[in-house]
């Protein structure tokens, strides 16, 4: 099961929200993020862990991750998650990390896709899509994503 493997990978990286899980061998954080982005129906709890990965591992292989995201048309998802991680870094006073994340966000901005999609649930109903379209953040709207994820939802993970 992709979700179980991903949860184990996130636990191995030290994600506090999954600290109760027995973790596997630690994987490359960039690979974990890409694996999650490629999952069509990603558990919301796992999607919420992704900004934490970017915030906690700002030295990951961004060149590889951005390239792989673009090849798979995932740059909007990565751009939005990078935006959320940057806003968390700013809130926490991690200015160097925020600056690095802003640079990655700017690089992703240049290849932003027009297509609207869900951050983690490709199987959303039309009613869910309408609700998210109305209630999403300006950042989610900018990245053409249907999600209500925001830094305020993630304080438990820090």
Regions found by a protein language model. Give the residues of each.
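Charge-dense, extended regions
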Residues: 95-158
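Mid-protein regulatory/catalytic core that forms ligand/cofactor-binding pockets
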Residues: 16-110
């Amino acid at each position: 099961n992709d979700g179980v493997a991903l949860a184990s990978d996130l636990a191995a990286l030290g994600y506090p929200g999954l600290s109760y899980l027995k973790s596997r061998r630690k994987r490359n954080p960039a690979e974990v993020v890409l694996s999650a982005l490629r999952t069509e129906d990603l558990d919301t709890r796992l999607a919420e862990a992704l900004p934490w990965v970017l915030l906690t591992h700002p030295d990951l292989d961004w060149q590889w991750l951005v390239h792989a995201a673009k090849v798979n048309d995932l740059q909007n998802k990565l751009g939005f998650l990078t935006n959320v991680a940057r806003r968390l870094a700013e809130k926490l006073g991690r200015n160097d990390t925020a600056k690095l994340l802003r640079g990655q966000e700017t690089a992703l901005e240049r290849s932003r896709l027009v297509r609207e999609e869900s951050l983690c649930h490709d199987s959303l109903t039309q009613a869910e899509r309408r609700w998210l379209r109305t209630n999403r953040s300006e950042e989610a709207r900018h990245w053409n994503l249907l999600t209500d994820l925001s830094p305020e939802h993630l304080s438990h993970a820090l």
